[in-house]
């Protein structure tokens, strides 16, 4: 009887040992797989979530001083280059024309308002050719070339991954264009990783994608 119980306990112990070994093996394999995936991702892609949706923008401006008239385009309306969108009535009546194809995204004036030459009537953006501006670390920029494919996810449409292509790589870091570049009078220099702007085209963005939205990009090396 005691011998049978001992045999039963030994079998249970062996079973627990086998189960423990199996679980340990699964954990080890999961760690190896995770490490391999991380290595593959880090060596084959450049990623950043420091990116925004952008589009070519142009202001429709008053060509002369006077009062605005015949301005009846709401935000969201499209215009073509050369379209007469309003008139300025001053010493003479002058047409206000759009300087590019685009969509009205912000109205700046109302009919009857007095404006000076150069006053912005409205802001337009080319919504048909939106793109991504991504800031890439200087340590990663050598791994990127024009023509590289890109996976783009926009925060405004997070369930969709858009196809993209690297179109342009900046010739200077963002800090180069700071109005007041930092100076260091103490003599102590702190090295900061710089960012280079990269322009990425987006193929067939949805209506949910709007200029200024945040985005994440994964660029194939």
From Swiss-Prot:
Keyword Cell cycle (UniProt): no
Chief location: membrane
Pfam families: CusB_dom_1, HlyD_3
Keywords of the record: Cell membrane, Membrane, Transmembrane, Transmembrane helix
TM spans (from-to): 17-37
Subcellular localization(s) per the UniProt record: Cell membrane
Membrane topology summary: Single-pass membrane protein
Any Gene Ontology CC annotation: plasma membrane
Family: Belongs to the membrane fusion protein (MFP) (TC 8.A.1) family.
PANTHER family reported for this sequence: MEMBRANE FUSION SUBUNIT OF EMRAB-TOLC MULTIDRUG EFFLUX PUMP (PTHR30386), TRANSPORT PROTEIN COMB (PTHR30386:SF26)
Protein name: Putative efflux system component YhbJ
Lineage: Bacteria, Bacillati, Bacillota, Bacilli, Bacillales
């Amino acid at each position: 009887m005691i011998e049978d119980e001992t045999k039963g306990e030994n079998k249970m112990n062996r079973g627990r040992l086998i189960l423990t070994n199996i679980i340990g093996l699964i954990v080890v394999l999961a760690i190896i797989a995770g490490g391999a995936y991380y290595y593959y991702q880090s060596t084959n892609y450049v990623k950043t979530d420091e990116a925004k949706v952008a589009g070519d923008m142009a202001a429709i401006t008053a060509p002369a001083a006077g009062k605005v008239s015949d301005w009846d385009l709401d935000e969201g309306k499209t215009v073509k280059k050369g379209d007469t969108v309003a008139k300025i009535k001053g010493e003479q009546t002058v047409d206000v024309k759009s300087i590019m194809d685009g969509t009205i995204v912000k109205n700046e004036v109302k009919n009857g308002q007095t404006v000076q030459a150069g006053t912005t009537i409205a802001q337009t953006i080319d919504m048909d050719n939106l793109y991504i501006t991504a800031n890439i670390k200087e340590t990663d920029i050598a791994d990127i070339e024009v023509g590289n494919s890109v996976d783009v996810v926009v925060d405004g449409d997070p369930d969709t991954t858009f196809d993209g292509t690297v179109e342009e790589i900046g010739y200077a870091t963002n800090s180069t264009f700071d109005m007041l570049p930092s100076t260091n009078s103490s003599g102590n220099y702190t090295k900061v990783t710089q960012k280079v702007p990269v322009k990425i085209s987006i193929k067939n963005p949805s209506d949910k994608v709007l200029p200024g939205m945040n985005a994440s990009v994964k660029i194939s090396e």
